[in-house]
Amino acid sequence: MGSAGFSVGKFHVEVASRGRECVSGTPECGNRLGSAGFGALCLELRGADPAWGPFAAHGRSRRQGSRFLWLLKILVIILVLGIVGFMFGSMFLQAVFSSPKPELPSPAPGVQKLKLLPEERLRNLFSYDGIWLFPKNQCKCEANKEQGGYNFQDAYGQSDLPAVKARRQAEFEHFQRREGLPRPLPLLVQPNLPFGYPVHGVEVMPLHTVPIPGLQFEGPDAPVYEVTLTASLGTLNTLADVPDSVVQGRGQKQLIISTSDRKLLKFILQHVTYTSTGYQHQKVDIVSLESRSSVAKFPVTIRHPVIPKLYDPGPERKLRNLVTIATKTFLRPHKLMIMLRSIREYYPDLTVIVADDSQKPLEIKDNHVEYYTMPFGKGWFAGRNLAISQVTTKYVLWVDDDFLFNEETKIEVLVDVLEKTELDVVGGSVLGNVFQFKLLLEQSENGACLHKRMGFFQPLDGFPSCVVTSGVVNFFLAHTERLQRVGFDPRLQRVAHSEFFIDGLGTLLVGSCPEVIIGHQSRSPVVDSELAALEKTYNTYRSNTLTRVQFKLALHYFKNHLQCAA
């Protein structure tokens, strides 16, 4: 084998290996290190400069050379051992980390391991009609065989979408401010608090004062009791007649009570008042109650009571003073006249309001019919708005202009349901078609996901043949004030129905009583040529075009802040 050299100070060290022999043949190479690896190692020291360092005077001294040689031997041995140790350690670590992870020690008997249910079981627990209604950050609308799916933002072009999203978010935030949203976080009562206090139900009108019920102190005895109440939107006071040294901060946002008399403290707390100092609506003030390290908080709601809008049914409470029938017609005068005649057969004196956006106005000779004309083709929902805006009775019955009243069209039954329940709208059926559907909402940051399912939620208490649902057919009785509050979007001009119930979700409580049935006129073509021409024109407006569908999707995305529907 060859030799390899390296410099140490002013000396040259040459390491040679060749079997078990030294290759230099010099006396200095007579000391062997023994066998290592492939053979014995030989070290040769060659003085490079006799005049260098401490060896200048003894450059030829064997004793000094042997000592230095011995040191180098030790260094080489240490180096070899280090390399061997490093290789062994690497193999050991590799074996350790490549081996399976050891099992964690099992908990002691009787100790329950803390864990949540797997997602599959959570889905089963919190699913309704195939939809997982558990709080989560994002939602999605999955289409199925019976129900298609829509992603509403697809109604916009990709270049327009960023600006639309920005405007939509700004309008949504404005809506939230007006509605007092999001609601305040839940108040959590800490354990072992020394206070008694209201957790819900304290309300005050703007600029009014109310007593705060239920305040009490149940802490341990103390030389001096100090209790501090703090508000943020109003001021605090007490009706107790006590010195200012006992109660500080009357009429301020912070009220401090300090006394050594426990009974007096109880009396003062029983008569604490809250005053709204600003004209605000739908606000919640969180009042804190503190003593030493204990803190309790409770809400005070600031809002006006709802002003009622009542309809006088008259001393005899006749049906005509309770119900108005409303309809919208377009290019179907013959259908409208047949429907009106059927109404008069069963309800001769009920007021009927007709909104018409046909080209040619009709002449209707009926003292109980109010007929309103509109610009031609103004639209389906615009006509609905016009009709219900003229209703002056407690209830309004909506019908299509091609319906047919019969002996099973019992308006009184629907009135009885609304009078005895909290429903806002109750539908019947059209020739047995109930068309009940449920709307389920999942909320997320980018907009809610709307799920539509056919059917109903539950039976209606007190009316075994009726149910609670989200939407019904175009034959329904409704509280006039509620219907006017939700309204019909006039931008929906042609094909629209479910959109009204989507707008009313969260406002309208809807039911269905299929036993109340209205008929439908024949769909067979008419013989009269003029009427046939009108029907042909009507059908061109009736069709749902791709442009109209895209418009409705965009409307749901922006107006209703929906993300998708399925």
UniProtKB/Swiss-Prot annotation:
- Cytoplasmic face: residue ranges? 1-67
Q: Which domain of life is it from?
A: Eukaryota
Transmembrane regions listed in the UniProt entry: 68-88
Tissue specificity as recorded in UniProt: Widely expressed. Highly expressed in colon and to a lesser extent in kidney, stomach, ileum and rectum.
Q: Does the keyword Disulfide bond apply?
A: yes
Catalysed reactions listed for this entry: an N-acetyl-alpha-neuraminyl-(2->3)-beta-D-galactosyl derivative + UDP-N-acetyl-alpha-D-galactosamine = an N-acetyl-beta-D-galactosaminyl-(1->4)-[N-acetyl-alpha-neuraminyl-(2->3)]-beta-D-galactosyl derivative + UDP + H(+); a 3-O-{alpha-Neu5Ac-(2->3)-beta-D-Gal-(1->3)-[alpha-Neu5Ac-(2->6)]-alpha-D-GalNAc}-L-seryl-[protein] + UDP-N-acetyl-alpha-D-galactosamine = a 3-O-{[alpha-Neu5Ac-(2->3)]-beta-D-GalNAc-(1->4)-beta-D-Gal-(1->3)-[alpha-Neu5Ac-(2->6)]-alpha-D-GalNAc}-L-seryl-[protein] + UDP + H(+); a 3-O-{alpha-Neu5Ac-(2->3)-beta-D-Gal-(1->3)-[alpha-Neu5Ac-(2->6)]-alpha-D-GalNAc}-L-threonyl-[protein] + UDP-N-acetyl-alpha-D-galactosamine = a 3-O-{[alpha-Neu5Ac-(2->3)]-beta-D-GalNAc-(1->4)-beta-D-Gal-(1->3)-[alpha-Neu5Ac-(2->6)]-alpha-D-GalNAc}-L-threonyl-[protein] + UDP + H(+); a neolactoside IV(3)-alpha-NeuAc-nLc4Cer + UDP-N-acetyl-alpha-D-galactosamine = a neolactoside IV(4)-GalNAc,IV(3)-alpha-NeuAc-nLc4Cer + UDP + H(+)
Tell me the GO BP annotations in alphabetical order.
lipid glycosylation; negative regulation of cell-cell adhesion; oligosaccharide biosynthetic process; protein import; protein N-linked glycosylation via asparagine; skeletal muscle fiber differentiation; skeletal muscle tissue regeneration; UDP-N-acetylgalactosamine metabolic process
Q: Is the keyword Disulfide bond in the record? A: yes
GO cellular component term of the entry, any = membrane
Q: Which UniProt keywords apply?
A: Cytoplasmic vesicle, Disulfide bond, Glycosyltransferase, Golgi apparatus, Membrane, Signal-anchor, Transferase, Transmembrane, Transmembrane helix
InterPro entries this protein is in?
Answer: Glyco_trans_2-like, GM2_synthase, Nucleotide-diphossugar_trans
Q: Look at the named UniProt entry and state the broad enzyme category this protein falls under.
A: transferase
Give GO MF terms, alphabetically: acetylgalactosaminyltransferase activity
Q: What is its EC number?
A: 2.4.1.-
Q: Please give the function described in this protein's UniProt entry.
A: Beta-1,4 N-acetylgalactosaminyltransferase involved in the biosynthesis of Sd(a) histo-blood group antigen. Catalyzes the transfer of N-acetylgalactosamine (GalNAc) group in a beta-1,4-linkage from UDP-GalNAc to the galactose residue of NeuAcalpha2->3Gal-R to form Sd(a) glycan epitope GalNAcbeta1->4(NeuAcalpha2->3)Gal-R.
Name of the protein in its database record: Beta-1,4 N-acetylgalactosaminyltransferase 2
What species is this protein from? Homo sapiens (Human)
**Lineage start:** Eukaryota, Metazoa, Chordata, Craniata, Vertebrata
